[in-house]
């Protein structure tokens, strides 16, 4: 059985969020929460919130044991980009892309053996 949590249109660049996501993929949820607490990146608290949501979904919806959960899938997709313009010299303007992310975490029960 699998439980899933998704955070859509989060205001962090996918490239930066993937650096943190790579640290926790495939780990047990207790270990993953510890890693996220000690990782000094802006994406860490956001990903931790999604992970805790996935754990809560597993406990509440599917009555799984939280101590027996493993992160089976964890990925970051690109969301819509907010386009802003910054004035530059000689009347020009340059575009600034404020990127967003869709963060997905799937937890499942650890296989026996």
From Swiss-Prot:
It comes from the Bacteria. Keywords: Ribonucleoprotein, Ribosomal protein, RNA-binding, rRNA-binding. Coiled coil: none annotated. GO terms for molecular function: rRNA binding; structural constituent of ribosome. One of its GO terms (cellular component) is cytosolic large ribosomal subunit. GO terms for biological process: translation. CDD domains: Ribosomal_L22. The keyword Lipoprotein does not apply. Belongs to the universal ribosomal protein uL22 family. Part of the 50S ribosomal subunit. This protein binds specifically to 23S rRNA; its binding is stimulated by other ribosomal proteins, e.g. L4, L17, and L20. It is important during the early stages of 50S assembly. It makes multiple contacts with different domains of the 23S rRNA in the assembled 50S subunit and ribosome. This is Large ribosomal subunit protein uL22.
